[in-house]
Curated annotation (Swiss-Prot):
DNA-binding region, residues: 41-60
Domain HTH tetR-type: 18-78
Cited SUPFAM superfamilies: Homeodomain-like, Tetracyclin repressor-like, C-terminal domain
Annotated gene: comR
Organism for this UniProt entry: Escherichia coli (strain K12)
Keyword terms of this UniProt record: Copper, DNA-binding, Repressor, Transcription, Transcription regulation
Protein name, per record: HTH-type transcriptional repressor ComR
Activity modulation: Binding to the promoter region of BhsA/ComC is released in the presence of copper.
Biological role: Represses expression of BhsA/ComC by binding to its promoter region in the absence of copper.
GO process annotations (BP): negative regulation of DNA-templated transcription; regulation of DNA-templated transcription; response to copper ion
Length: 210
């Protein structure tokens, strides 16, 4: 029995390490978030994820494919949760926006991730010839703005926003506030500072919807 047990241990030690896709994406996310797409090399990704280059290629095809998978992971882990704050029927429009901004401010200043917004950080570091990656990020930004517009349209239909208010322009304005919060966080702004920005925006709400 002892011999059989020893053989089992030896066999288990010899098994190849299983590739953990989610863990690899989270590690790659931190690199792209901190340094940007173009400044992050495949060698950096191999070192951070602990996976061999052929494994990453087999799973994601190339660096661009890995980035797209990371972007999807970011949206699932962070952006979608922020946007969920908007669509709680029990909240007033101001309360929903306050919770949305608070979730974003906490994310942008979290000690667990690099400062700022993953998407905005990457956009600001791309070169003019970045091509498909730039288009992918631009498309996602447009989705964020459309989500805000959808939220505002719903609240307008409920009578919380006057019918004459242009919710398209209002969504653009709110999206610009978020971009400014990201840049401020990247420059070292604290959670309290970002909450002040959000608070000022909400205090202006009656004027914004006139």
């Amino acid at each position: 029995m002892a011999t059989d047990s020893t053989q089992c241990v030896k066999k288990s030690r010899g098994r190849p390490k299983v590739f953990d896709r989610d863990a690899a994406l989270d590690k790659a996310m931190k690199l792209f978030w901190q340094h940007g797409y173009e400044a992050t090399s495949l060698a950096d990704l191999v070192e951070a994820t602990g996976a061999k280059a052929p494994t990453l290629y087999a799973e994601f095809t190339n660096k661009e494919g890995l980035f797209r998978a990371v972007l999807d992971r970011y949206i699932d882990r962070f952006a979608a949760k922020h946007e969920a704050q908007l669509f709680c029927e029990e909240k007033s429009v101001e309360s929903a926006l306050a919770d949305y901004f608070a979730a974003i401010a906490n994310c942008f200043t979290s000690k667990d991730t690099p400062a700022g917004c993953f998407m905005i950080n990457n956009c600001t570091t791309l070169s003019p010839d970045s091509g498909d990656i730039a288009n992918t990020l631009k498309s996602r930004h447009a989705m964020q703005e459309r989500t805000l517009q959808q939220f505002l349209c719903q609240r307008q239909a409920r009578g919380e926003i006057p019918p004459h208010c242009d919710v398209t322009h209002l969504a653009e304005f709110l999206n610009c506030i978020i971009q400014g919060m990201s840049i401020s966080a990247r420059e070292g702004a604290s959670l309290e500072k970002l909450m002040q920005i959000a608070g000022t925006t909400l205090r202006l709400w009656p004027e914004l919807v006139k």
